[in-house]
Every structure is written in C-alpha cells, then in structure tokens.
C-alpha cells in the first residue's frame, strides 16, 4: 500500500516538474552538446520529443526491502540452465572465443560468464531508449553530473554512426549491448571486431566480445591466473584475516593450512591473494586473486565477481560449490530497515558505520568487524541476524547505563 501511494505521488507530481523544468533543462543541454561538436541531426534524432520517464526515476530510487544473501545471489545467476547454455555457446563460438583468448589473454569461459551474467547470452539486452533514460537521470539531480556525461557520450556514439538514435536501446541506467557497456565505457574500450567500420555491440557478437576482452585486458588481466576459487579453511582459522584488503602470497596461506575446497593443494599463482567470506564465517570461503580486482573494476560487487568466477568455472566443466551456499551459514537476510537499525546502533556506540542508508558498504563492514572483535565473535564483518540481535542487546544495555561509547578496538580495513 505504501508503494502504491509512493507511485501515485510520483505520477501526480513528476509531470508538473517535467513541464516546468525539463524542457528548459533540455534546451540548455542541447546548446552545450552542440558547443561540444554534436551535430544538429543527432540532437534532433535523439532528443526531439523526449520527456522524463517516470519508470526510470522509480527504478533509480528503488531500494530493495531485503539484502540479498550470497546464496540467493549465486542461486539466481549460476543456474543449471545458464551453465548448460554457456557450455553450448563455448562450442558454437569456439573460433571467435579462441581468437580472443589468443589476442587478449582472456579465457573463453570467462568471456562467456560475463555474457551470461550481463544479458543471459544476449536474451535481455534491454528495451529502454538510452538517450531518453540518460536525459531523465541527468535531469533528476541525484547523480546528474555522471548521467549528463553519459548522455553526451551516447550522442557522440550516435554521431559517429555506430548506431541510430532509434536503435540505441539498453537498460534503464544506460547500459548497452551484449556486455552492457555504459556510453563512456563504449567510447573508451569498444572495438570493431568484425571489421565493418562500425562498432555494433547490440547485433555484432564479434564487436561485443572483442570490446569486453579489450576492456579486461586494459584493466590489467593476468593471463593464466584465476579470478577466485573455493577453499577450505583450517580449524582455528583467524577470521580477522578473511577480508579483501588482507593479501598474502599463496604459499603463506598454504602454510596456514588453507587448501582447495576438496582438500587439494592450492595452485601456484604469482602475486598475493585474499580470503573472502561472502556469507560470513559459516558460509563458503573463497581465495581471490589479482583478476578478482579486474572483475571488480567491471562491477564493484564482491558477489558479482564471485559469480563470474563460479559461472566460468562450471562452464569450463568444473564442479558446483563444495560448501553449498544455501546450506551453510545463517540463511536469513536482514531487511534494509534492520541494517539501518544496526548502522544506527553501531554509530551511537562510536563504531562509525557511516551513513544510515541500509547499504552494506566498507564502513559498515568495518564497524561490524570492530564490534565482533570487542565481543569475542568471529570477526567476519557479516551482518548476520544473530549479530544484529547482539548489537541491539548491547546498544540497549549501553543506553540504559548512559555509557554508549564502547572501548577502543583494533582497526580493520575492508
């Protein structure tokens, strides 16, 4: 019911706002774009007759009711059907994928995994008009500078003849094509893979795949090295060491008793690696390598990077997780409101969880780690329901005593 009234308010108020402000904003933007060299023909084709899209604003402002556990995230993305389809495409597109691996050093299975996660192998490219969506977001104000820049780049792509304004479709946030490139990413990394003089990431798979491989190579991909692998941690493992920022050579982890999930020796990999626990100390554990950081440049989500690694592993013939994510750890997820409650309580106890926004960012994770260290809990930074219950209990007791600030504790960085 609350959602209904919110949407009703948007539908009633937004057109008034649009009529009074959007047209003048768009006129000023057109002048700016023309001054930057965008042709009048492109401006007319892309911007004439557009209006703010209420659906785009709704999607941009929406916050999920519940956080998504790693088990849920992986279960929705690394499915049997997606693995099977990926294996089929690995064979069907062997010539293209082999050529890309040779040229860029990106494994075939990794490119297929990105393709599967971004658009389900081209099945869901998005149907939003990109110029209209970006203009809506640039006008709305929350991240206007970013989307204004993206809109200018989208117009430059049209102006260069890569796609028509009518055919520039994608996600509500402006991501385009098989690999969901933002316009700025397109202009920086997109490649004409089929040699026809245009870069068509919507219809040309060689263009889309070459562009993705080029991006990953430029982001620092390490050939012949993994993104992540599932590991088994020894009894008595110091959970404080399980965080992305804590990097050790693989041989150091071996000396600490870490093995692969099936109890085999860890692979020999150059560089330093970290242990991450996406669902807390009771869930699956992963060792992540330099290529994990490369994937995080594509999408700043630990769960996304692990899903890329796991889908690539299974598409290449590897097994599913040994420690099944859905059966390990605390199955429940906090609601956004519950996480806000935890953040507020941690802040009031002097542990600096950052803005009370219901988003599990690095500052919130660090504050949880500090709290866990103070209370002799496994220090994993994970907002499990049991941790929330203890935080609320501690906060209530401290508030009743008039001494909310907790004693100093070790510092952690995610």
What residue spans do the PLM features occupy?
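Positively charged n-region of N-terminal signal peptides that target proteins for export
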Residues: 1-4
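N-terminal signal peptide c-region/cleavage motif recognized by signal peptidases
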Residues: 13-15
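Cleaved targeting-peptide boundary
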Residues: 18-26
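Proline-rich, low-complexity linker regions of envelope-associated factors in Gram-negative bacteria
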Residues: 19, 318-332, 382, 386, ...
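Intrinsically disordered, low-complexity polar regions and short flexible loop motifs
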Residues: 33
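Catalytic glycan-binding domains that act on GlcNAc-containing polysaccharides
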Residues: 38-270, 283-286, 295-336, 358, ...
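Low-complexity, glycine/alanine/valine/leucine- and proline-rich hydrophobic stretches
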Residues: 290-291
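Short acidic, glycine/serine/threonine-rich helix-capping segments at coil-helix boundaries
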Residues: 332-339, 347-391
């Amino acid at each position: 019911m609350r959602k209904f009234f919110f949407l009703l308010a948007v539908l009633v108020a937004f057109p008034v706002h649009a009529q009074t402000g959007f047209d003048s904003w768009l006129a000023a933007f057109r002048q700016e774009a023309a001054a930057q060299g965008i042709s009048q023909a492109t401006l007319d084709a892309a911007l004439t007759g557009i209006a703010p899209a209420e659906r785009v604003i709704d999607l941009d402002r929406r916050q999920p009711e519940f956080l998504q556990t790693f088990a849920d995230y992986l279960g929705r993305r690394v499915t049997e059907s997606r693995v099977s389809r990926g294996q089929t495409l690995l064979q069907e597109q062997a010539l293209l994928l082999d050529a890309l691996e040779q040229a860029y050093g990106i494994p075939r299975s990794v490119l297929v995994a990105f393709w599967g996660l971004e658009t389900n192998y081209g099945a869901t490219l998005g149907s939003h008009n990109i110029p209209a969506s970006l203009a809506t977001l640039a006008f709305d104000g929350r991240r206007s500078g970013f989307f204004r820049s993206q809109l200018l780049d989208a117009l430059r792509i049209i102006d260069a003849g890569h796609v028509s304004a009518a055919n520039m479709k994608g996600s509500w946030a402006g991501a385009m094509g098989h690999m969901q490139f933002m316009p700025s990413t397109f202009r920086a990394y997109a490649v004409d893979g089929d040699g026809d003089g245009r870069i068509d990431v919507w219809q040309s798979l060689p263009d889309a795949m070459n562009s993705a491989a080029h991006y990953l190579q430029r982001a620092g991909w390490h050939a012949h090295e993994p993104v992540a692998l599932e590991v088994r941690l020894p009894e008595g493992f110091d959970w404080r060491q399980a965080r992305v920022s804590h990097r050790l050579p693989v041989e150091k982890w071996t000396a600490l008793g870490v093995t692969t999930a099936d109890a085999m020796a860890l692979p020999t990999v150059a560089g330093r690696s970290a242990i991450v626990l996406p669902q807390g100390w009771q869930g699956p554990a992963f060792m992540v390598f330099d290529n994990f950081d490369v994937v995080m440049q594509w999408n700043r989500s630990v769960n996304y990077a692990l899903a890329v690694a796991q889908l690539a592993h299974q598409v290449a013939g590897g097994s599913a997780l040994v420690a099944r994510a859905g059966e390990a750890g605390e199955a429940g997820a906090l609601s956004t409101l519950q996480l806000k409650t935890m953040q507020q309580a941690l802040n009031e106890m002097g542990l600096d969880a950052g803005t009370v926004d219901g988003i599990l960012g690095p500052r919130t994770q660090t504050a949880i780690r500090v709290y866990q260290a103070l209370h002799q809990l496994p220090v994993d930074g994970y907002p499990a329901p049991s941790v929330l219950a203890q935080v609320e209990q501690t906060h209530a007791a401290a508030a009743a005593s008039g001494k909310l600030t907790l004693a100093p504790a070790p510092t952690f960085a995610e």
